[in-house]
UniProtKB/Swiss-Prot annotation:
Family matches, as HAMAP family: Ribosomal_bL19
UniProt cross-references to InterPro entries, sorted A to Z: Ribosomal_bL19 (IPR001857), Ribosomal_bL19_CS (IPR018257), Ribosomal_bL19_sf (IPR038657), Translation_prot_SH3-like_sf (IPR008991)
Compositional bias per record (Low complexity), positions renumbered to this chain: 125-134
Source lineage: Bacteria, Pseudomonadati, Pseudomonadota, Alphaproteobacteria, Hyphomicrobiales
Name of the protein in its database record: Large ribosomal subunit protein bL19
GO BP annotations listed: translation
Organism: Methylorubrum extorquens (strain PA1) (Methylobacterium extorquens)
Gene name linked to the record: rplS
Length: 134
């Protein structure tokens, strides 16, 4: 094992941040700490994850949303202290790792179909029902 990889793993373990599993195509809400003068507040940024880049401590993801008819993209480092929390709202069904083609799309053609796989809650209920039946 590389020394740098080992140091990165230790740092990620030290940060102990719970980051949900999300992929490009998923709609996420990123709560970002914003400092205005002396005050610090949390601002929600909701959009579609169009890319994930890097790995380890340097991993980042790009979120795209439409604000007042204008497309806005923002790149967030996954392990940034400015990120308060990340929540996955819905899972998207896509065939690409980078969804940059959404930049040129408008309206219905920019929609992403929701993935039909069962949610964690549904999986847990099914497992509980299976154990109760036995």
């Amino acid at each position: 094992m590389n020394i740098i990889e080992q140091l990165e793993r230790e740092e990620v373990a030290r940060l102990a941040k719970t980051i949900p599993d999300f992929e490009p195509g998923d709609t996420v809400i990123v709560n970002v700490r914003v400092k205005e003068g002396e005050r610090t507040r949390v601002q929600a940024y909701e959009g579609v994850c169009i890319a994930r880049n890097g790995g380890g401590l340097n991993e980042s993801f790009t979120v795209r949303k439409i604000s007042y008819g204008e497309g806005v993209e923002r790149v967030f480092p996954v392990h940034s202290p400015m990120i308060d929390s990340i929540k996955v709202v819905r899972r998207g069904k896509v065939r690409r790792a980078k969804l940059y083609y959404l930049r040129d799309r408008r309206g219905k053609s920019a929609r992403i179909v929701e993935r039909s796989d069962r949610s964690d809650k549904a999986k847990a209920q099914k497992a509980a029902a299976a154990t109760a039946a036995e």
